[in-house]
Curated annotation (Swiss-Prot):
GO terms for cellular component: apoplast; pollen tube tip. The gene is PMEI1. This is Pectinesterase inhibitor 1. It comes from the Eukaryota. Residues 1-25 form the signal peptide. The N-terminal alpha-hairpin extension is required for pectinmethylesterase inhibitor activity.
């Protein structure tokens, strides 16, 4: 009898947790709403649909920040490789500026994680916005070059798109 009561209590608790968890899940309609607010809705929908199965908003923010930081780190390594490989002085100056921007962007993304963890959507928003500015500044710097590494341009555009998604999500999070 006691075992039966424990099973019932366990099942009741499990059902309660499932109901609570599902009430915070992001629906495909909400994903569309998020993506409609970005500068590149088609990129956003493709990204969210391939990465997520109805996460909650904080999980969605974390995974988006994870992807953004991974891409920024990859871009930073590529930039350092280009500089180390030898380029003309003008290109070296532009790529060096990009390295500085990406070092700063990665730092801003690390702080965005901290704000997310503490439930501070506004703080996350400010740090993601700063990271987006870094990618944008790098794009401006390299567009002036005669010969540009396409992976730097493509990665910077992807980072801008990912930051756009994170910014929309941050606006949906609580403000501290």
């Amino acid at each position: 009898m006691a075992a039966n009561l424990r099973n019932n209590a366990f099942l009741s608790s499990l059902m309660f947790l499932l109901l609570i968890g599902s009430s915070y899940a992001i629906t495909s309609s909400e994903m569309s709403t998020i993506c409609d607010k970005t500068l590149n809705p088609s990129f956003c929908l493709k990204f969210l649909n391939t990465k997520f199965a109805s996460p909650n908003l904080q999980a969605l923010a974390k995974t988006t920040l994870d992807s953004t930081q991974a891409r920024a780190t990859q871009t930073l390594k590529k930039l350092q490789s280009i500089i180390d490989g030898g380029v003309d002085p003008r290109s070296k100056l532009a790529y060096r500026s990009c390295v500085d921007e990406y070092e700063s962007a990665i730092g801003n993304l690390e702080e965005a994680f901290e704000h997310l963890a503490s439930g501070d959507g506004m703080g996350m928003n400010m740090k993601v916005s700063a990271a987006l500015d870094g990618a944008d500044t790098c794009l401006d710097d390299v567009k002036r070059l005669r010969s540009v590494d396409s992976s730097v341009v493509n990665n910077s555009k992807t980072i801008k798109n990912l930051c756009g998604i994170a910014l929309v999500i941050s606006n949906m999070l609580p403000r501290n």
